[in-house]
Amino acid sequence: MEKNLYSMKGKVCLITGGSTGLGSYIAHGFLAAGASRVYITARSKDNLVKKKNELEKISDGECIAIKSDLSSLDGVNKLVSEIRAREQHIDVLVNNAGIGLGTPIKTMKVEDWDRTMELNTKSPIFLTQALLDMLSKNATLE
């Protein structure tokens, strides 16, 4: 039982912000644990391709890189369309994409704050909402 608890065998996963940092480590862990397909998304195509090639070497699972900008609802909808065209269900969604301004409050611009809020708070909610039916197909209580 305990061994199966951590198995990702046959799972389909989507990780936003999956090309670097925490998202890339999560993708690595899922593939190492037997996930069949792990989708990683990010804004940088170069980072995505590099990470995809790196991750596919560690397991028999497939890593699929999708360039996407989730800082707008249009970007969220484009990603949802892409996933729906490829999959019937998703087992795991990791809303990891995010940015931090690092700008002193004195010089912060409204546009930068709005973009941060779109990506960090609005996009995860509406991405999850748009994929709920796909997530619930194989949902379990565990």
Which residues make up each language-model segment?
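Active-site loop of short-chain dehydrogenase/reductase
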Residues: 11, 89-90, 135-142
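Conserved glycine-rich cofactor-binding loop
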Residues: 19-21
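Conserved glycine-rich Rossmann-like NAD(P)H-binding loop of the short-chain dehydrogenase/reductase
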Residues: 35-50
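The beta1-alpha1 cofactor-binding region of Rossmann-like NAD(H)/NADP(H)-dependent oxidoreductases
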Residues: 46, 67-78, 110
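Conserved NAD(P)H cofactor-binding loop of Rossmann-fold oxidoreductase domains
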Residues: 96-101
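Substrate-binding pocket helix/loop in short-chain dehydrogenase/reductase
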Residues: 104-105, 112-114
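A short, exposed helix-loop element centered on a Lys and neighboring polar residues
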Residues: 128-129
